Swiss-Prot record:
Involvement in disease: Oocyte/zygote/embryo maturation arrest 18: An autosomal recessive female infertility disorder. In affected women, ovulation and fertilization proceed normally but embryos are arrested at early stages of development or cannot establish pregnancy after implantation.
Outcome after substituting E616V: In OZEMA18; uncertain significance
This protein's record includes keyword Transmembrane helix: no
Single biological process term from Gene Ontology: negative regulation of non-canonical NF-kappaB signal transduction
Annotated function: Suppresses TNF- and CD40-induced NFKB1 activity at the level of the IKK complex, by inhibiting NFKBIA degradation induced by TNF. When associated with PYCARD, activates CASP1, leading to the secretion of mature pro-inflammatory cytokine IL1B. May be a component of the inflammasome, a protein complex which also includes PYCARD, CARD8 and CASP1 and whose function would be the activation of pro-inflammatory caspases.
Protein name (record): NACHT, LRR and PYD domains-containing protein 2
Domain remark in the UniProt entry: When isolated, the NACHT domain is involved in interaction with CARD8. This interaction is not detected for the full-length protein, maybe due to autoinhibition, this inhibition might by relieved by an inducible change in protein folding.
Pfam families in the record: LRR_6, NACHT, NLRC4_HD2, NOD2_WH, PYRIN
Phosphoserine modifications at: S671
Localization per record: Cytoplasm
Length: 1062
């Protein structure tokens, strides 16, 4: 053996630092390592009596120096003498590396430049693995760690299996806390993976399985558990080989061959590479953290290669494997965050996608019970987390559950109130951070370093800190020791030399901390911080689109602007918040101030303001809103309720309550499920009550629209109480597609006798219990409704009869919209009877898509003769045809008829119908506006209409002919008519094939004409220079004429509908 002088560090000097008790413990621990079988030959009495110097002589005489060094380092760590371990590592680094490289060849062509030399920490981890896998021969029994193989020496496959098993057992230590619930979760998802499910038989084709989900939910744990199952021969589908490829580690490699990529950690298998790869059907590849590969756009599909000996960039090699150009028969399992799914969809052939959702609610509850031990404390803490929907959602990540439990348990033990801690995620994370260090620790520099690392990583879209990154930023690994001990950082157990944050959400919190802390003077001169910008850049809409991980950091930035939290941080770390942070946040680039916003922008802003818990800040921001549109789920209702009640200038509010995430939405028959839904409801009701209180407190709030929403009985009750109150001043109310069915009925009753409501739309109710409630509203003597929209509702003939009678009684309604209802013959006749009633004051009526036929038009024509008030009628999307038009024209000819606007959009009208309309328009008719859009009137129909336009008695002011199949040669007739017409103000020729010649003819006519036309709509070729020049000439000579070149599509809202309903 070797002398002590040949060791890489002075072990004797280190042992002299130990007390007598510590030296005895060192002796005991070092003799427990089975690898040093030579130690077994040494009498224990010699070891027991030896002092430090004698012990070193014994060890170095009988054992290999590499073993003595690694074992000693491990013993020092077990004794918690990290000072001695670190000191030894500094001395042994170079010597140990040389020693290790003599014993282990370099990996398959990966040079030192391509792969950095192993550090002593990495050597120590490998030593632990090798120590467990060490083989000892005794007769015909071979021992491999704790495994026993009878009859023969283990082959390379068995040895590799055991090393992998040892490696992946470490996964249960990769996050703080117990692992029982993690294992339960892993077993649950394993049944969804074909090659780990006993019910799925092996098929002729290999599987590609993609596990996807947000960060920290257990994708890597599940992948590593699969590897462990393979190593222990517990995988249902038997693979001879399995390889674990960590993209976190691979992202640091330069170009290499596929063989070098896969076998870089298995140099002992390099002679068998061709044999192994030839058995692709028996190989499982686990590609973990695909989103961490950091490949440039297009890199994965560029230069795809099937040659496993050819050097290529790592993304190309993985892309070739996923695309099944490389080893097409191998089985693949990939884990990724959702952001990389697009690339996978392009690459992978018919993958099976499995969404990993982490801890279910029962998992979280079980975890809390095990962590606390005391059931009362556990359930109190669990309910506190559950009361904050955003925090509860984060709790699907095991690490977040551990943070919550650790923080709240400590507070309860101290007798502190944990309720404020769970109010916001910022409050919880700050309390957790401060609880890991004593107050007054003055760790200002260390915290700023950590927050800088978090920000750098978040901008790079990684939670991993590589040793090279630390060196580039001037950070020593020893600087991270405090945060490793505090469980804020974790050392990666697969990719050595890497560190990661406990969870992405905590990294986002630390990033926000970097931007909100007051800068030190030396930082202003430090160039390496500028590449991640300031708060303005962090909250930039453009940057958040590029990197969605920044969004939550923006939330936490607002949360850290809270003065109480700033004091807590200063007391612990000696750090101060920037005094200008609030003003910087107010200047941020969230583009939804003043009401001009997308729903996503607005929800982000409300979430940010809620995190701040600063009412003055909220009031200042929300005062700018006059209109607001909220999409609410269990998470968003909390910040929305907190902020909207401070919208003192709000005039209009739109709500969409998402069914999937709010209370009472989960269908279940079991009684415990009913209880659970009731508990959900109780958590959410206070916030909903706060939100609805604005209807009674804000006298300027006049408009409410609730669309596509699920409202439980409790939510409806609270809403009804608020809108029925005397202090509610709503004028326009819209309820569209609200479930369950009885919600419409209850909301209608809440409006009964409401004096200020003048506009009401009810849409999408398929139950018949709403009509009696609506009739009550209409009959009430204090009803002031002027507009009623009853759209797409189901009703019986008797209910249409009741509604017709209510319309006769009502004295306020002037406009009724019955679109998309099946009136049929009986319903139509009942309505016509009402329209004939002398006390019916309806002026505008829409019967769009009510399944009316030409026969209904005969009765309707009679109504037009006797009705004293009806001025607007819409019959769009009813197949009345030419015969129906003929009947209508008979009624319109009577001088008693008051109708001014008639909409016949898409009514199966042809040129024959235009002939009857032409005869009507040539007489002195009351009709001023006519919409014939989407009817095939063609050349002949257009000729008839132009004939009418030429007549001096034609009073038509608006003519809409969108999509009427008008060809270019009809433009000659039209130009002639426009030249002499003195009444037409609006003409719509959109979506007609007028051609360049027809449009040119129209433009030339308009250039010379001094007629009454003020709005012309048509489609032109944007690239026709001649037409564009004529258009400019018209605009110059006739600035009052507006020419709409149809940049938008009118299907969503017809032009005629603008003037139809109030």
């Amino acid at each position: 053996m070797v002398s002590s002088a040949q060791m890489g560090f002075n072990l004797q000097a280190l042992l002299e630092q130990l007390s007598q008790d510590e030296l005895s413990k060192f002796k005991y621990l070092i003799t427990t390592f089975s690898l040093a079988h030579e130690l077994q030959k040494i009498p224990h009495k010699e070891v027991d009596k030896a002092d430090g110097k004698q012990l070193v002589e014994i060890l170095t005489t009988h054992c290999d120096s590499y073993w003595v060094e690694m074992a000693s380092l491990q013993v020092f760590e077990k004794m918690h003498r990290m000072d001695l371990s670190e000191r030894a590592k500094d001395e042994v680094r170079e010597a140990a590396l040389k020693s290790f490289n003599k014993r282990k060849p370099l990996s398959l062509g990966i040079t030192r430049k391509e792969r950095p030399p192993l550090d002593v920490d990495e050597m120590l981890e490998r030593f632990k693995t090798e120590a467990q896998a060490f083989t000892e021969t005794k007769g015909n029994v071979i021992c491999l760690g704790k495994e026993v193989f009878k009859g023969k020496k283990p082959d390379k496959d068995n040895r590799c299996r055991y090393i992998l098993k040892t490696k992946f057992r470490e996964m249960w230590k990769s996050w703080p806390g117990d692992s029982k619930e993690v294992q339960v979760m892993a077993e649950r998802y394993k049944m969804l993976i074909p090659f780990s499910n006993p019910r799925v038989l092996p098929g002729p084709f290999s599987y590609t399985v993609v596990l996807y989900g947000p960060a920290g939910l257990g994708k890597t744990t599940l992948a590593q558990k699969l590897m462990l199952d393979w190593a222990e021969d517990n995988l249902i589908h038997k693979f001879k080989y399995a390889f674990y490829l960590s993209c976190r580690e691979l992202s640091r490699l330069g170009p290499c061959s596929f063989a070098e990529l896969v076998f870089r950690d298995w140099p002992e298998l390099q002679d068998d590479i061709p044999h192994i790869l030839a058995q692709a059907r028996k190989i499982l590849f686990v590609i973990d953290g695909f989103d961490e590969l950091g490949a440039a756009p297009g890199a994965l599909i560029e230069d795809i290669c099937g040659d496993w000996e050819k050097k290529k960039p790592v993304p190309v090699l993985l892309g070739s494997l996923l695309n099944r150009v490389m080893l097409p028969k191998a089985a693949l399992l990939v884990t990724t965050r959702p952001r990389a799914l697009r690339d996978l969809r392009i690459l992978a052939e018919e993958p099976i996608y499995i969404r990993v959702e982490g801890f279910l609610e029962e998992d979280r509850r079980a975890y809390f019970l095990r962590h606390f031990g005391d059931e009362d404390q556990a359930m109190r803490a669990f309910e506190l987390m559950r009361s904050n929907a955003a925090l509860f959602q984060l709790g699907s990540a095991p690490a977040v559950c551990w943070i919550v439990c650790t923080t709240l348990k400590l507070q309860m033990e101290k007798g502190e109130d944990p309720v404020p801690t769970c109010l916001t995620r910022t409050g919880l994370f700050l309390r957790f951070l401060c609880s890991r260090f004593p107050q007054g620790a003055q760790l200002r520099g260390a915290l700023r370093t950590l927050s800088l690392l978090a920000a750098q990583g978040l901008w790079a879209q990684t939670s991993v800190l590589h040793r090279e990154d630390l060196e580039r930023l001037g950070v020593q690994e020893s600087d991270l020791r405090l945060f490793l001990d505090g469980d804020i950082l974790r050392q990666d157990r697969v990719s050595k030399g890497c560190y990661s944050f406990i969870h992405l959400s905590f990294q986002q919190f630390l990033t926000a901390l970097f931007y909100t802390l007051e800068k030190e003077e030396e930082e202003d001169r430090d160039g390496h911080t500028w590449d991640i910008g300031d708060v303005q850049k962090l909250l930039s809409g453009v940057e958040r689109l590029r990197n969605p991980d920044l969004i939550q950091a923006g939330y936490y930035s607002f949360g850290l602007a809270n003065e109480k939290r700033a004091k807590e941080l200063e007391a612990t770390f000696g750090c101060r918040m920037s005094p200008d942070i609030k003003q910087e946040l107010l200047r941020c680039d969230i583009s939804c101030k003043g009401g001009h916003s997308t729903v996503t922008d607005l929800q982000e802003l409300l979430g940010c303001l809620y995190e701040s818990q600063e009412e003055e800040l909220v009031k200042e921001v929300m005062a700018q809103f006059k209109e607001i549109s909220l999409h609410l789920n269990a998470v968003d209702v909390v910040p929305s309720s907190f902020c909207v009640k401070h919208c003192r200038n709000l005039q209009k509010m739109s709500l969409q309550v998402i069914k999937e995430n709010l209370p009472e939405n989960v269908t279940a028959s079991e009684s415990d499920a009913e209880v659970e839904r009731s508990q959900d409801d109780q958590h959410m009701l206070p916030f909903w009550t706060d939100l609805c209180s604005i209807f009674g407190s804000n006298k300027d709030l006049m408009g409410l629209a609730i669309n596509d929403s699920f409202l439980s009985a409790s939510l409806v009750r609270i809403l009804c109480e608020q809108i029925a109150s005397d202090t509610c001043h709503l004028q326009r109310v819209v309820f569209k597609n609200i479930s369950p069915a009885d919600a419409h009925r209850n909301l209608c009753l809440a409006l009964r006798g409401h004096k200020t409501v003048t506009y009401l739309t009810l849409q999408g109710n398929d139950q018949d219990d709403m009509f009696p409630a609506l009739c009550e509203v209409l009959r009430h003597p204090e009803c002031n409704l002027r507009y009623l929209g009853l759209v797409s509702c189901s009703a019986t003939t008797q209910q249409w009869a009741d509604l017709s009678l209510a319309l006769e009684v009502n004295q306020s309604l002037t406009c009724v919209n019955l679109s998309d209802n099946e009136l049929l013959d009986e319903g139509a006749k009942l309505l016509y009877t009402t329209l004939r009633h002398p006390k019916c004051f309806l002026q505008r009526l829409s019967l769009e898509n009510c399944h009316l036929t030409e026969a209904n038009c005969k009765d309707l024509a009679a109504v037009l003769v006797v009705s004293r008030e009806l001025t607007h009628l819409c019959l769009a999307k009813n197949p009345i045809g030419n015969t129906g038009v003929k009947f209508l024209c008979e009624g319109l000819r009577y001088p008693e008829c008051k109708l001014q606007t008639l909409v016949l959009w898409n009514c199966d009208i042809t040129s024959d119908g235009c002939c009857d309309l032409t005869k009507l328009l040539q007489e002195k008719s009351s009709l001023l506006c006519l919409d014939l859009g989407l009817n095939h009137i063609g050349v002949k129909g257009m000729k008839f209409l132009c004939e009418a336009l030429r007549k001096p008695l034609c009073n038509l002011r608006c003519l809409w002919l969108w999509g009427c199949s008008i060809p270019p040669f009809s433009c000659e007739d039209l130009c002639s008519a426009l030249s002499c017409n003195q009444s037409l103000v609006t003409l719509d020729l959109g979506q007609n094939p007028l051609g360049s010649s027809g449009v040119k003819m129209l433009f030339e006519t308009l250039t010379c004409s001094s007629g009454t036309l003020r709005t012309l709509r048509l489609k032109i070729d944007d690239f026709n220079d001649e037409l564009n020049k004529l258009l400019e000439e018209i605009e110059e000579k006739n600035p009052q004429l507006i020419i709409d070149t149809e940049k938008h599509h009118p299907w969503a809202e017809r032009p005629s509908s603008h003037d139809f309903m109030i």
